[in-house]
C-alpha cells in the first residue's frame, strides 16, 4: 500500500497547530505497520537549515495554475522510514512570518495541490501512490483536481483520495473569479453540488464533494458536524455523504510527550514514581511563576490559544469565583487582547492565586503538564484535542467539556465505582465548569482516590498505532487491489 500525505505542515519541519502533529506522527505509525508512506509539504523558508541541508534535489517541473505555468522543484528527505518531499517555489513559500493568512492563499495552495498531482508524472512508476491523503482546506481542491483534470490519464486512473477534516471552522473561502483564474475550472462546477457555497468558492467543500472517503479526527466530532450547531453551514454536504464519513481518533507520539524522558522537567518520573516526581515539578513550577510554594493546594493548568473556541470566555466568567477557592491557577497562551489583559490583570491583583504567561513557551508548557494537578479544557468544540492526552500521560487530570475528541478520550470520574481518568461537564455553561473544578478540588483532598485516578490516566494508551490500523483499513477499502 503506497500512501501520499498532502499537507501544509508537519513536525518537525513546520508547525502552527495540531495538524502538524498528526502529519508528523501518523505516517511513522503507518510505516511501522507496513505501508509505504510519503509526505508532501511546501518548502517554506521557515524550515530550519539543518533539515534543508539534508534535502536532495530531484527535479524541476512546470505546474499549471489556471492559465499560468509556474515553475517548481521537488526535494526529498528520508527520515524514520518515511519519505518527505518538499515542493519548492520561492515566490509562494519563501516568505517571512506566518505560513497562512497571505492575500494570495487561494493561489498558493491551488499551486501546491496541482504540484502534488504533477509530481506523479515525474516519479518512478513504482512510487505512484494508491491513495493520496489530504488534510484540511489547504489541500481540499486536490481531490477535485484529480477527478476533473487528471483521472483520465495513465498513472492516475486507480488513485483514490481521503480527505481529513481537522477543523471545519476554517474552510478556505474565496471569490468566484478563483474558479477559472486559479483552478482552471468551468462554471459547471460552481454549483451547490460542486465547490460553490454561499456564492463563493469553498476549498473545504471541494474536498468534501470529490474525495472518495472523508474522515474527522474523532468519532464524536464526526457526529457533531452533521448538526447545524457544529456544521459551520456545511452540514447538508456532510449529511449527503454521511456513509463516506468516519471518525478516527488522533493519537499521541509518546516519544515526544513522556514525563520519563522530558528534558524540560526538573525531575523525570513514571507511574511508579509519580508522587515524588509531580511534587518536585509542582514546587519548581510554583516557584518559577511566583506562586506560593504549597504542596497542599491543587494547582490547575491551562495551555491554549486565548480564544472563545477554547472556552476561554467560561474561564473569564468564573474568574472571581476562582479567587475564592483554595486553589492555584496557571494560564499560558496568547490570543484575543481582551483575554490577555484580563489574565495579566488577575495575576497582578491575586498573585497568590493566578499566574499568567502571555505568549507560548514549549518548555513552560511541558512543566505545566508535569507540575499541575489538573488541566482545564472547557472547549466550545474540540475536533480531537491533544492537550488532554498529554496531561493524562503527565498525571494532570483533565477537566473537559464533553465535546468532540474530549468526550471520546476523557472518562469522567465516578465516585461510586472509582472509574474514570478525569472530570467533565456536559453543557457549555460557566456554572457547570465551576462545579467540575469544585468536584476536582474535593477529590484532590481524598489522596488515595486522586492517586488512583492519576495512575489510571497515566496508563491510558492513545498511541498512533491504533489510529494507523484504522486508516490502513480505510485505505484498503477504497483501494483493495493495492496490497
UniProtKB/Swiss-Prot annotation:
Q: Which InterPro entries does the entry link to?
A: Glyco_trans_1, GS/SS, Starch_synth_cat_dom
GO biological process per UniProt: glycogen biosynthetic process
Q: Where does ADP-alpha-D-glucose bind?
A: 15
**Pathway of this protein?**
Glycan biosynthesis; glycogen biosynthesis
| Reactions catalysed according to its record | [(1->4)-alpha-D-glucosyl](n) + ADP-alpha-D-glucose = [(1->4)-alpha-D-glucosyl](n+1) + ADP + H(+)
Q: Any idea of its EC number? A: 2.4.1.21
Q: GO molecular function of the protein, one example?
A: alpha-1,4-glucan glucosyltransferase (ADP-glucose donor) activity
Give the keywords, sorted: Glycogen biosynthesis, Glycosyltransferase, Transferase
What is the top EC class of this enzyme, as a single word? transferase
Domain of life, per lineage: Bacteria
What does the UniProt function comment say about this protein?
A: Synthesizes alpha-1,4-glucan chains using ADP-glucose.
Similarity comment: family membership: Belongs to the glycosyltransferase 1 family. Bacterial/plant glycogen synthase subfamily.
Protein name in the entry: Glycogen synthase
Please name the gene that encodes this protein.
Answer: glgA
Amino acid at each position: 500500500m503506497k500512501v501520499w500525505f498532502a499537507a501544509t505542515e508537519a513536525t518537525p519541519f513546520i508547525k502552527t497547530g495540531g495538524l502538524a502533529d498528526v502529519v508528523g506522527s501518523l505516517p511513522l505509525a503507518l510505516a511501522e505497520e507496513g505501508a509505504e508512506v510519503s509526505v508532501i509539504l511546501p518548502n517554506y523558508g521557515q524550515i530550519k537549515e539543518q533539515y534543508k541541508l539534508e534535502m536532495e534535489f530531484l527535479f524541476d517541473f512546470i505546474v499549471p495554475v489556471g492559465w499560468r505555468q509556474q515553475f517548481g522543484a521537488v526535494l526529498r528527505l528520508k527520515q524514520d522510514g518515511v519519505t518527505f518531499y518538499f515542493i519548492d517555489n520561492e515566490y509562494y513559500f519563501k516568505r517571512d512570518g506566518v505560513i497562512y493568512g497571505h492575500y494570495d492563499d487561494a493561489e498558493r495552495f491551488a499551486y501546491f495541490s496541482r504540484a502534488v498531482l504533477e509530481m506523479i508524472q515525474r516519479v518512478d512508476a513504482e512510487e505512484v501512490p494508491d491513495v493520496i491523503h489530504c488534510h484540511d482546506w489547504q489541500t481540499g481542491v486536490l481531490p477535485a483536481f484529480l477527478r476533473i483534470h487528471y483521472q483520465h490519464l495513465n498513472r492516475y486512473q486507480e488513485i483514490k483520495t481521503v480527505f481529513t477534516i481537522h477543523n471545519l471552522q476554517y474552510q478556505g473561502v474565496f471569490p468566484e473569479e478563483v474558479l477559472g483564474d486559479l483552478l482552471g475550472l468551468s462554471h459547471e462546477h460552481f454549483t451547490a453540488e460542486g465547490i460553490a457555497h454561499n456564492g463563493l468558492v469553498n476549498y473545504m467543500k471541494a474536498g468534501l464533494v470529490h474525495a472518495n472517503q472523508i474522515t474527522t479526527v474523532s468519532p464524536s466530532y464526526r457526529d457533531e458536524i452533521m448538526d447545524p450547531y457544529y456544521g459551520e453551514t456545511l452540514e447538508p454536504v456532510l449529511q449527503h455523504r454521511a456513509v463516506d464519513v468516519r471518525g478516527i481518533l488522533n493519537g499521541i507520539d509518546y516519544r515526544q510527550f513522556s514525563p520519563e524522558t522530558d528534558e524540560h522537567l526538573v525531575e523525570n518520573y513514571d507511574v511508579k514514581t509519580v508522587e515524588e516526581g509531580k511534587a518536585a515539578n509542582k514546587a519548581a513550577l510554583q516557584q518559577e511563576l511566583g506562586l506560593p510554594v504549597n504542596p497542599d493546594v491543587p494547582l490547575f493548568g491551562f495551555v491554549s490559544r486565548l480564544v472563545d473556541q477554547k472556552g476561554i470566555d467560561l474561564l473569564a466568567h468564573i474568574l472571581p469565583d476562582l479567587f475564592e477557592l483554595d486553589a492555584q491557577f496557571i494560564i499560558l497562551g496568547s490570543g484575543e487582547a481582551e483575554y490577555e489583559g484580563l489574565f495579566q490583570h488577575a495575576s497582578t491583583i491575586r498573585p497568590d492565586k493566578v499566574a499568567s504567561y502571555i505568549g507560548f513557551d514549549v518548555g513552560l508548557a511541558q512543566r505545566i503538564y508535569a507540575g499541575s494537578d489538573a488541566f482545564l479544557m472547557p472547549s466550545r468544540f474540540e475536533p480531537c484535542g491533544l492537550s488532554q492526552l498529554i496531561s493524562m500521560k503527565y498525571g494532570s487530570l483533565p477537566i473537559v467539556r464533553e465535546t468532540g475528541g474530549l468526550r471520546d478520550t476523557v472518562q469522567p470520574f465516578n465516585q461510586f465505582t472509582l472509574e474514570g481518568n478525569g472530570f467533565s461537564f456536559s453543557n457549555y455553561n460557566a456554572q457547570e465548569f465551576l462545579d467540575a473544578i469544585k468536584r476536582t478540588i474535593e477529590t484532590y483532598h481524598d489522596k488515595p482516590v486522586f492517586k488512583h485516578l492519576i495512575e489510571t490516566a497515566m496508563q491510558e494508551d492513545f498511541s498512533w498505532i491504533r489510529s494507523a490500523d484504522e486508516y490502513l483499513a480505510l485505505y484498503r477499502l477504497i483501494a483493495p487491489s493495492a496490497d
